[in-house]
Amino acid sequence: MTDMEKLLEALKEVRDDIDFSGQYGLVDEGVIDSLDLTQIIAALDEAFDIHIPAGEIEPDNFNSVQDMLALVRRYQGK
């Protein structure tokens, strides 16, 4: 399973009503809210065995799956 597939699977567990693969502006446009964001961070932490620090919790890191994947990759292996 690729990192992108793992990411999409984790996101689907949080919000299965959103097609994350084609979405941009997830936070900026209100597609996901603060509760979703909290659940997404927990799902990513668990799926990738990483810890996302509070300083990284900003809209630019969660507006698209590409942004989230870049965030995950920054913390893999740390």
Where are these predicted regions, by residue range?
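Two-component histidine kinase catalytic core, primarily the HATPase_c
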Residues: 36
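C-terminal structural segments of small proteins and small subunits
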Residues: 54-78
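Phosphopantetheine carrier-protein modules
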Residues: 12-31, 50-58
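Residue-level recognition of oxygen-bearing side chains
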Residues: 6, 25, 67
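Thiotemplate assembly-line natural product biosynthesis machinery
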Residues: 1-19, 70-78
